[in-house]
Amino acid sequence: MALVTVQRSPTPSTTSSPCASEADSGEEECRSQPRSISESFLTVKGAALFLPRGNGSSTPRISHRRNKHAGDLQQHLQAMFILLRPEDNIRLAVRLESTYQNRTRYMVVVSTNGRQDTEESIVLGMDFSSNDSSTCTMGLVLPLWSDTLIHLDGDGGFSVSTDNRVHIFKPVSVQAMWSALQSLHKACEVARAHNYYPGSLFLTWVSYYESHINSDQSSVNEWNAMQDVQSHRPDSPALFTDIPTERERTERLIKTKLREIMMQKDLENITSKEIRTELEMQMVCNLREFKEFIDNEMIVILGQMDSPTQIFEHVFLGSEWNASNLEDLQNRGVRYILNVTREIDNFFPGVFEYHNIRVYDEEATDLLAYWNDTYKFISKAKKHGSKCLVHCKMGVSRSASTVIAYAMKEYGWNLDRAYDYVKERRTVTKPNPSFMRQLEEYQGILLASKQRHNKLWRSHSDSDLSDHHEPICKPGLELNKKDITTSADQIAEVKTMESHPPIPPVFVEHMVPQDANQKGLCTKERMICLEFTSREFHAGQIEDELNLNDINGCSSGCCLNESKFPLDNCHASKALIQPGHVPEMANKFPDLTVEDLETDALKADMNVHLLPMEELTSPLKDPPMSPDPESPSPQPSCQTEISDFSTDRIDFFSALEKFVELSQETRSRSFSHSRMEELGGGRNESCRLSVVEVAPSKVTADDQRSSSLSNTPHASEESSMDEEQSKAISELVSPDIFMQSHSENAISVKEIVTEIESISQGVGQIQLKGDILPNPCHTPKKNSIHELLLERAQTPENKPGHMEQDEDSCTAQPELAKDSGMCNPEGCLTTHSSIADLEEGEPAEGEQELQGSGMHPGAKWYPGSVRRATLEFEERLRQEQEHHGAAPTCTSLSTRKNSKNDSSVADLAPKGKSDEAPPEHSFVLKEPEMSKGKGKYSGSEAGSLSHSEQNATVPAPRVLEFDHLPDPQEGPGSDTGTQQEGVLKDLRTVIPYQESETQAVPLPLPKRVEIIEYTHIVTSPNHTGPGSEIATSEKSGEQGLRKVNMEKSVTVLCTLDENLNRTLDPNQVSLHPQVLPLPHSSSPEHNRPTDHPTSILSSPEDRGSSLSTALETAAPFVSHTTHLLSASLDYLHPQTMVHLEGFTEQSSTTDEPSAEQVSWEESQESPLSSGSEVPYKDSQLSSADLSLISKLGDNTGELQEKMDPLPVACRLPHSSSSENIKSLSHSPGVVKERAKEIESRVVFQAGLTKPSQMRRSASLAKLGYLDLCKDCLPEREPASCESPHLKLLQPFLRTDSGMHAMEDQESLENPGAPHNPEPTKSFVEQLTTTECIVQSKPVERPLVQYAKEFGSSQQYLLPRAGLELTSSEGGLPVLQTQGLQCACPAPGLAVAPRQQHGRTHPLRRLKKANDKKRTTNPFYNTM
């Protein structure tokens, strides 16, 4: 079927009546203005059907060249118009059979507007000689009066009788006959309706044509042939003589066979006589006496085929004729037409929206390749409330196959169900054998896609189309019933339904106020369950487990009872509400956590929900209110339980030892972080449960904040998404909170394991682990990571209401300062845990689930399932890591996490998706908030703080980084670590608070975040003593944060992408930088970022300056936060990728931030580095430093000494430049070499990771995993140095360096924090070590936790660094310089790209950056 356009030059008609008007719109104006008129016809072989202009503008502007599908029909139409009056138009032209081979005959239905403005029609017989297609003669004029009758003759023809005249017409094909009958019946109906009788005033214009009959006599005789004249067709063959005895039985058989034949034959090239002959051949009998019955049945079948079949409410399946029936299409509400043919044109391009799949109905046709596009097109129609017509030629094979494929994907049906459904509604449906095979293949693809939860078949622009693939707990996100079709989807729906009410609680983070000694722990206790597992991601295992949990109703109680991942499946609110269940949840949550983490990682976009910082703030506040870890102000029992969990931390440490052995065994993995993430997947999940440890009331408050944020107008849409995620969080959090202490332990274990692995691979690792074991703070750090995850989940909720967030931030700013210690650490822990979970989920679904379970037990490390699971997971991880290498494992974790986030992260940067950018912004905002809170922190600290907020774990890493930071600057002096101890503790308390908030946004910091301890007990930047510490801590914290930011930025951004995508949009982010730190809005911490939002709104440069200023002034915290936010926003908005790079560089610059690097960072720190660094250090000192310093005071010296050897030369600069962020590339020398080893593994494993992860998340995941492993660091660092992006990243790396610098500045600016920043540097290095466990210089705090925290910080920092980069382009050169000075920034850079590019690009960038920086960022280099 083709669309042809015919030019007609109106020639004045001598007999045209003045009152006659043109039939088709546009004719009159054409007549009044003598110019060529174009008429459009829908043509098939032997027939042309006039296409009315849709609304004047629909006339297709098609060139008048010959249409290859129209044959000579176009020329014939052109000639016919010469005989017509200008006011008349051709409604139909049908080619008829002719007795003479050299003659072509057409039956033409001509219409015009009559005297009463009614349509009057006549039939003209046109003759063409075979040798001249341009000359036409008229041989017949037959007016259609009201008494016109039409009869089928049974031989493929029909007779028209009117006014005692009978004429026989035999179209050349069934299709042509069908077209002729349609037009004739329509004309006859009009004649009957208006009573056109002979002799009336109607059809007076017939005389014009009667006077123009000019065909030769033979042609006129043929037109006037009598009814009794036999057809020239021969009789049926006399082969079959016996007539069926049972006529009815024969007729039934004829109906069946006739339909089959008509479905198989091209009706344009076959006559009813030939169809009858075919029937006779098949039935082996003569059907001559059934010919009338056959013709009538044929018309019935044609009628059925000619009307589109409504398959779904928004989908019609039809033929080319349906596509050409404008009136019918408009009456049915069709606005979209999917044309699955190569031979049929779009008939009304100006009226309908077309999508063309240009293929033939052949077995060689690859229709499968187009089904993703067709799915999007149909979904687009549905989204806009319109109907879509899917048509091919007959609506039998090509279009039917396309609709079946759509049903399979849209509703999650298998092929049999979809085929039966479509066949039931359109019985002629019959895909050709090749299409059926392709449908079977598509079924497998959809199943696999569902299982690995990737976005292979889901476009980002139309992600809402395949809602069933979205995380089960996506309260705010649209959870379509279709999505729920799959078991995973159903579970998701259940979760959503169950979790929706608890959304506010979801983000609840119970932070059990602990003694001054346990302040860090309090922070850790406030773990945010950020992971919303996309049920579909783990279509198989996770889906089943999750489904079971969801089906259970998996409320907090369910989660508590189940040792799977109830948090993900349970309602956080319930869990939060039920403090008593918290411990149980913690115990059983780990198993679920791992799976959940996997699911979350896979469904990062939808799954990860940033929990509002407000919630984080509440828990933080609570700890300050109740210093005793066992006396949570809101829920003592819960806190007590948390306390118990803290006690259990020792068990975790023993588990840590086990993990150390494992890590040693799987040192080849050289991805301690990767391993930790896998092992810590369970731990991270435990950490998620750790949120439970947070005071229940605090959790409730946080959840309430989350819900309030979600309810805000801005949050309305995003809020819904956030809510869904919050639900997931809710489910996660309630168990999380119950398990918070437990989770902390789990996080500690994970952290420990990670560090131990790193230690196995490097010197600093073991020491770090040792510190962690003695220092319960580390456990809280891990919890912090999880909290950050939870917070991050909250953040998306908050993001919906940017304004609210900003306000909350402002209001919560003071609180942030106050509760920084508690909230931040908790947030950090949660984030890290979540990140770890996400990353863990990424390595391998099955493996991850197993690991998750094992990790969780590990996280519990208590007698029981957790411990056993830990052992099992250790074994599995060991085997898997040995098999794939630690780096690969981490890569797969990151990759999986990115699979959903991937699009968010990678796409977010390019797309400017709100999700990813907002997470970064949020992260950055939080950093500035932390800065504000810590007023004393240097720019570096501000960055750290921001990261802290984002991942509670980040603070601990920052603390480590802080210690390390000074080391690079001042050397690995043990006293720096010791000195930091006290200060760092305080700072950490404050920083983690902000960091938790910040981290909440960048949930993706899986393992790193865990490292952050709840040292953020120094909640108030107002603290005088802690204040100075905070300043120092902020610096060191910022470095740690940077590191964490790097990894976390990648991971978190990914997760946030999902969450933020739902809740925050790039425009919103840029418009409302405050929104970025949704966590702020969510929790009191969010209030603090509010100050930053203002700054954030300011130019990125301002932000950098502000950060610098913030470090200098008591308000630095606020200014830093603001600037960070600004930078973050800028970073996200301008180019998530580039900014990510920047962040990555800064974050991952953990190589050698030596004194020069530190100074360089300092120099760059004010514009770019400052903001980023401040949060980093802040967070570090605040959460990890405070706790660790107090608990690891003695250990700090040892750890520093142990870590100094490695980090001092290599690690120190490493830490200094972007210690935490650089956890990706931990030790400069050893780490580099190890990174190289891991690099191959990570690359390999990345290749083995989920496809979606591989696509975008692969690189990010790889980077993230690499960050974790110090073995990979050396390798990656060189690569990073080489990375061209290094320069871009270097500014961010510089941020890490800047952190050191900021520490120095902070020391200068904030005497209160004399050299805490330096200890932070050490810690940064430690974090680096944690990531690369080998390079943990100051072991004041558990290196493992710091490492994890660092990882979180890195990832988190990355986004922030990116923001900074965006903020002040001028800082870019500085970053480059930093990169030159320290290789570390390069890794950070890589991390940032990781966020941007879905983890693959980041590695490359990191590589370049590392090469440039010559730091130990092997992880990034690996990619």
Curated annotation (Swiss-Prot):
**Occurrences of domain DEK-C (ranges):** 248-303
In the UniProt record, does the keyword Transcription occur? no
Membrane-spanning parts: none
In this chain, the stretch annotated as Disordered covers 1-37, 617-641, 664-684, 696-728, 797-825, 840-862, 877-954, 962-981, 1019-1041, 1070-1108, 1144-1179
Q: Name one GO molecular function term.
A: protein tyrosine phosphatase activity
Modified sites of kind Phosphoserine = 17, 25, 36, 461, 487, 534, 631, 633, 1217
According to the UniProt entry, which residue ranges have a biased composition of type Low complexity? 9-18
Instruction: Note the InterPro entries from the entry.
Output: DEK_C, Dual-sp_phosphatase_cat-dom, Phosphatase_SSH-like, Prot-tyrosine_phosphatase-like, SSH-N, Tyr_Pase_AS, Tyr_Pase_dom, TYR_PHOSPHATASE_DUAL_dom
Enumerate the Gene Ontology biological process terms.
actin cytoskeleton organization; cell differentiation; negative regulation of actin filament polymerization; protein dephosphorylation; spermatogenesis
Basic and acidic residues bias locations? 664-680, 910-932
Q: Where are the active-site residues found?
A: 392 (phosphocysteine intermediate)
What residue spans carry the Pro residues bias annotation? 621-635
Bias kind Polar residues: ranges: 889-904, 941-953, 1019-1034, 1144-1172
UniProt catalytic activity: O-phospho-L-tyrosyl-[protein] + H2O = L-tyrosyl-[protein] + phosphate; O-phospho-L-seryl-[protein] + H2O = L-seryl-[protein] + phosphate; O-phospho-L-threonyl-[protein] + H2O = L-threonyl-[protein] + phosphate
Per the record, its GO cellular-component terms are: acrosomal vesicle; cytoplasm; cytoskeleton; extracellular space; focal adhesion
Its annotated compartments are: Cytoplasm; Cytoplasm, Cytoskeleton; Cell junction, Focal adhesion; Cytoplasmic vesicle, Secretory vesicle, Acrosome
Provide the E.C. number(s) assigned to this enzyme. Answer: 3.1.3.16, 3.1.3.48
- Every Tyrosine-protein phosphatase domain range: 307-448
Subcellular location, principal: cytoplasm
- Cite the effect that the entry attributes to residue 392 to S: Abrogates phosphatase activity
Sorted alphabetically, the keyword list is: Actin-binding, Cell junction, Cytoplasm, Cytoplasmic vesicle, Cytoskeleton, Differentiation, Hydrolase, Phosphoprotein, Protein phosphatase, Spermatogenesis
- Role played: Protein phosphatase which regulates actin filament dynamics. Dephosphorylates and activates the actin binding/depolymerizing factor cofilin, which subsequently binds to actin filaments and stimulates their disassembly. Inhibitory phosphorylation of cofilin is mediated by LIMK1, which may also be dephosphorylated and inactivated by this protein. Required for spermatogenesis. Involved in acrosome biogenesis, probably by regulating cofilin-mediated actin cytoskeleton remodeling during proacrosomal vesicle fusion and/or Golgi to perinuclear vesicle trafficking.
- Misc remark for this entry? Tyrosine phosphatase activity has not been demonstrated for this protein to date.
Q: How does it assemble?
A: Interacts with filamentous actin.
What is this protein's record name? Answer: Protein phosphatase Slingshot homolog 2
> What species was this sequence derived from?
Homo sapiens
Gene giving rise to this polypeptide: SSH2
